[in-house]
Amino acid sequence: MNNEEDLLQEDSTRDEGNETEANSMNTLRRTRKKVTKPYVCSTEVGETDMSNSNDCMRDSSQILTPPQLSSRMKHIRQAMAKNRLQFVRFEATDLHGVSRSKTIPAHFFQEKVSHGVCMPRGYLEVIPNPKDNEMNNIRATCFNSDIVLMPELSTFRVLPWADRTARVICDTFTVTGEPLLTSPRYIAKRQLSHLQASGFSLLSAFIYDFCIFGVPEILNSKIISFPALTFLNNHDQPFMQELVDGLYHTGANVESFSSSTRPGQMEISFLPEFGISSADNAFTLRTGVKEVARKYNYIASFFIETGFCDSGILSHSLWDVDRKKNMFCSTSGTEQLTITGKKWLAGLLKHSAALSCLMAPSVSCRKRYSKDRKDLKKSVPTTWGYNDNSCIFNIKCHGEKGTRIENKLGSATANPYLVLAATVAAGLDGLHSSNEVLAGPDESTDFYQVEPSEIPLKLEDALVALEEDQCLRQALGETFIRYFVAMKKYELENEEIAAERNKFLEYFI
C-alpha cells in the first residue's frame, strides 16, 4: 500500500474503526477527485477571496471555465510544438526561495495540469524530527505525506537556458486539496488579496546583487576563484546579455544591470510590476543566473567574502485598486510622502524587528546590519530617509511614477515571496492602526507617534521579536510562524557558524 493509502487508512481507522477495504478504496477515489478539481489553476490574485480567520482555510482561487482552460492549453500546446519541447518543470519555492521541482515528459503535461504532480512534503518543508512535529501538530499524520503541485498556467514559459524544456510555477496543496499553509507563495498571494480588499494594489520590483566567479584554480596549493567580471562591465558581456535576454523570455523584464561594489559583483534591477509577478521574477532569477553561469563554466553566488550581498531589496509603491494613481506621491510638489505613504512607512518601522527575522533569516546575513558599527550592541536603530541610500527604508521621490519606498532589510537568504508578504502585512497594519494617525500633512519628518522597533543583531532575538509580533503572526498564519521559528531554532542549536557558512555556500551556489 502506498503512502497515500496508508494515510487514508490511518485516518479512517481513527474515525470509524471498522471501515472495510471497499470503503477505504472509495475514500481514496473521493480524495483523488478532490485534489484534481480545476479550482487550483489560478491566474489573478485579485480575484481570490481568502479569509484569514483561521489556518484551516481553503484557497478559493479563480476557477478556470472549460473554454478558458481550453484556450490556455491551446496556446501552450502551440508553444510546445513550436519549440519541440520534451520536458516541463513543475517548480515551487521552498523556505529559502530556492526552486524545488519535478520534471515530466512534455506529452504528460495536459494530464498533470488536471491531476497535479505529487512531491514528498519534506522537499519543501524540512523538519528536524518527523515524529516530533512542532509546526502543524493538529494534523501531524498529514505532515509526512505527499503534497500536490498544481500549475498556474499563466507562468508557463520556455526556458532559454535549458534544452527543450519549459517551466511552470506551481501552488502547493495537501493531498486532501487544501492549500499548504507554509507555502511562501500562498502567503504572499493572501496578503495581496487583503491589500486589494482595502482598496489598494502594490507595484513592486526586486533589486538583486550577485557575484560571478570563474572556475576555481589551484595556486600554490590553494584553491582560488577569481571574479569573472570587472568594474568596466565589458569583460564578459555575452554572459549578462544571455541572462537578461533569457529572463525577458521567461516573463521577467530587466530594467538595468551594472557592476556593483567589487569586481565580479553585479546588480540587476527588474521593471516594477503589479501583484505577485515581482516575486515570481526574483524566484526565476535565483535559478536562472546559476544555470546560465554553468554554461559559461562560471559560478553564480549571492555570497561574497564579507558575507551575503545586500541582495533582495524590495522597491515598492502603493496604488489605487484601478492602478492609475500612486498613493505615495504628494501633489504639493515637495519631496514628501502622502499621509497614506507615511502611515505605510510607520507600519514598516513599527514591525522592523520582526520583519528582519524573515528577511535576514541566518546568522551570517545579519552581520551586515552592524558592519559599519564599532560599538557592540544587541540592536541597531531602524533608519529611514528621503533619497538616502544608506537607510534601511529609503524613500525615493522621482516624480509620480517614481515615488517609492526601498525596503533594504532583505538579504540573499530571504525568500522573495516572504519579503513581499511581510512588507504588505506591516504596511497594512500601519494603514489600519489608529496609533499611527497623523496630526496633519506637515513638513515634519517625525511623523509617527510610536517609536520604531530596533533591529536585533542576533537571530535569537529576532525570533523572539517575530513570535511576539501579533500582527505578523495573524497575517502570515500561526502554522507558518510555528514552522519558521522551529526551523530556525533547530539551526541555531545544531550548527556552528562555520558549518552554517558551508551549508549556505553549498545550498545557494
UniProtKB/Swiss-Prot annotation:
A Gene Ontology CC term for this entry?
cytoplasm
The protein's name:
Lengsin
Q: In which tissues is it expressed?
A: Abundantly expressed in lens.
GS catalytic domain residues are: 184-509
Assembly and oligomerization: Dodecamer. Interacts with BFSP2 and VIM.
Q: What InterPro entries would the database entry show?
A: Gln_synt_N, Gln_synt_N_sf, Gln_synth/guanido_kin_cat_dom, Gln_synth_cat_dom
Q: What is the scientific name of the source organism? A: Homo sapiens (Human)
GO terms (molecular function) for this protein are: catalytic activity
Question: Region Disordered: what ranges?
Answer: 1-34
